[in-house]
Amino acid sequence: GIPASRANEYYQKCLDACEDLMELKVNGAPIYGLYQKSSDLTQNFVDLFLKKDDNPEIIFARDYSSEGNTHTWTSANIPYSQRSIATGGAEVNPGLNLVEAFEFIDNRDGKLKTRVNEDDANSDYIYYDNIGDIFNNKDPRMAATIMVPGSTFNSKQLDIQAGLAIWNESTGKYTLRVGDITASDASKNLYEGIQITGSDGPSSKDYYITHTGFYVRKFMEESTAAVGGSSTASWPRYRYAEVLLNAAEAAYELGLTDKVYDYFNQVRTRAGLNKIEAPTMEDIRHERQVEFAFESLRYFL
């Protein structure tokens, strides 16, 4: 490790290295910067990981091509109803904790709103008009990182439904009925002709279907080749957003509040979020969690 007495020296070297990289130019123009090509902020974050040409954010990456050098990320994580092979799909299941880590645009608390009064466990549930409305106004990066109920992939809306809430006249309560989308007998997933569990799960009956109700979106390619097991998306090892957050963290440790504000909020602004006036270390760590999900930079998401 590094002796505590040399901590500031270490942070200063980190900050200097980050700022040197920020200042690299060719013909007066910066070499690296945040990827900002689309006004649709969710699509912009999707494209960041799929567009290889004119992408100033990627500093180091492992590249793949269609000429025998591919990977299987898309086929390994494809939604259940879109599989091209029986033994593929949903190998990585995002959890609710990651979904809720993404803030709402107008509220930094990303917890999903399920009850009219969140402080009362007996409060009535909120009845949303559309299945995806509970995720409205989330940080645009969420929909580019995770597929949720109501998401679309390959021009097809995912059918994610845990079961049916059926009214019981005798008890005056709803009871939850769960079906089995993986059963060979389709009738086991029907209630009075209505499908119980969605065709994309969730279910614990099969390894290749989501168990949490969510699928990975980041790095997923909407192409026949990728769905069939030949993905060519690059894997970033180091990108400009990490340079900014490394610089922000080092500046925080050195007490350079103006630099913390600048570097940290560049990442948030690109995502369409409001700036934070005085970012804390917890804010920086949280930003890393949502910005770099599934990029092998954290042990726990």
Predicted feature descriptions by range:
Residues G1-G89, D109, K113-L301:
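Acidic/polar-rich alpha-helix caps and helix-coil junctions
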